[in-house]
Amino acid sequence: MRKKNIIITLTILISILFAQEFKLQFSFIPTGQGFANGDSNKVLNSIGGSFSQESSSDSIKVGDGFLKSSQNVFSEPPEISIYNFPSIINKSSEGVQVEAEVFDLNGIKSANLHVQVGGHNNEIIIPMTENQNNIFQTIIHDTLIDIANFRARVFAEDNLGFISNSLFKTGSINFKNNEMTMSHKNSYYPSGIQKNSWRLISWPGIPSNLSLAESNLNEGHVFYKYDPLSNEYIIPKSIELGTGYWFKHNYKEAVIFDEDTSTSIPLENYVVNLKPGWNIIGSPFSFPVSFKKDSTVGSLITFGIANKNGWSAAQNILEPWNGYAVFSANNSSITLIPFYDDNQSRSRTPSLEEWSLNIKVESESFFNYMTVIGRKEFAKNLTDTYDIPSPKFLENKLSIVTSLDSKNSYHYISDFRSTADFNGVWDLRLNAELGQKNIFISTSENSFFPEGLYFSLVDIQNKSINYEIIKTGSVVKYNSDLSLDYKIVSGDKNYVTITSEKILENIPDKYFLSQNYPNPFNPKTKLDYELPKRSNIQILIYNVLGQQVKILINKEQNYGSHSIFWDGLDQLGNEVSTGVYFARMTTSSFTQTKKMLLLK
């Protein structure tokens, strides 16, 4: 419209000048010429230049303001003033008509519609034709109207080669005939979901029927939705866009979800809101998409690869029909990006001191790749948003977790520390269901390592050190129902060697129960004991008749040196009488008894 207004103004002005019998001689308009001196009459024009009429001539000279304005008008690209694109498209054999109003003083050389289908970087160019004055139209063929949806923009070029383009426009597409199906080539589950295996799923697009019929596994299948506020699983009643669900069935054939009628959403950034804690989400797009998130949101992980169960490492894209678990330290969000432009891909460059190590465990039937340790510039050595707790999942037969306090609280799958330190020790615990034999521990680098950084894996149970853990991994012969303890030592070579050896030196060589002290005692005495590895341990008090008097401890306990007290009370809290008592320590492979004397 600006260009139209300018040309109208120029036309009116020229008409006025001709009406007053002024003669425009453009040969007198050199670029940059100053105004005439002497007895000339100067007329300020409305565009910012001036007219000057010399007394010796009937002609009018126009100042350079007029020329520059006219030059600017003709050098501007075409104006796309109207671009009509349907907000809702019904899939049909007729295609979709798109039109735009394009104007330029130089005339329009060409107008084209650039169509970009979801999941593709290239743009398909469709010529537009001028059906009436300045109105250009074209038809988007039915073959481009796919469940992936598309977006489009108009490009116009004038006769001087100047080009302009509109913004992208996109709409919703309504589909019928089961076109929105899990068997689509872009689906994470193109062959469906096999029986008796938990999987995470979500729905791309919006099904016309959002209801989920309530069912349990005994009836054939079951859905579960995770509620991060209550930390519980509930049976959902409806499908929610951007939400992931646990699904399991026991039907004979693989299950493939189809939707009779559904709608593809517009190809615009889609925000998935997150609550504090673990969230299970999905993508509403019918093709793989990237995403962006802030530092308080952890990595996205998913469950199951092909026919093997387990948890993945960090995922960089969200695929249709799949579900993803993600931890958020507070109320936050993830933005799904159907088209990742170059200016969106910029991220913070890690400092040279930062590093990240993915620790993986895998057995014949299960895997777990989600544990990560490392250092970040803004992380703290205490608990912060970079430290992610282990999730409450429906199925987790194998895991390796970390402890943030070097005690017995092994509840984290992510432990990042400050780059202010170079050397450090990470405590790890391997948990596995009985039957998960021949477990393989390996690592993968999620980043470049700082120069001079070394690692070792200290095996507490076998009292061994693997200095080549990054290259070779480590095989575990798992034949116990107990958790196994390990340590990752990182830092300079000297620190890693000395610290790894010192860790082994501080591990007791054997089970041991000390004599109580004081002995005789009244009414309290102390017992020290040592465990060479993590063990189920009992320490019981008996009288001379062999009757059990008190259970001092009966639990799984970490390796190392420990102490416990007996206060002279029985199991009911009553004082026992003077006499001889026995303290017996028992593990799966060890028993030792100490005689004690209570004197009042």
Region spans (language model):
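Surface-exposed, proline-anchored Ser/Thr-rich loop/turn motifs
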Residues: 188, 194, 274-276, 281-285, ...
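N-terminal exported-region signature
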Residues: 19-73, 174-367, 375-438, 443-453, ...
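Glycan-association/targeting regions that enable binding to alpha-glucans and other polysaccharides
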Residues: 71-184
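Terminal processing/anchoring signals of secreted or surface-associated proteins
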Residues: 41, 245, 324, 457, ...
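Residue-level detector of functionally pivotal "anchor" positions at catalytic/ligand-binding pockets or at interdomain
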Residues: 72-81, 345-347, 489-517, 532
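Short, compositionally biased serine/threonine- and acidic-rich segments at solvent-exposed termini, linkers
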Residues: 63-72, 466-506
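Conserved structural position at the C-terminal beta-strand
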Residues: 156, 490, 585-587
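Short, surface-exposed loop/turn motifs with a glycine/proline- and acidic-biased composition
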Residues: 534, 553-589
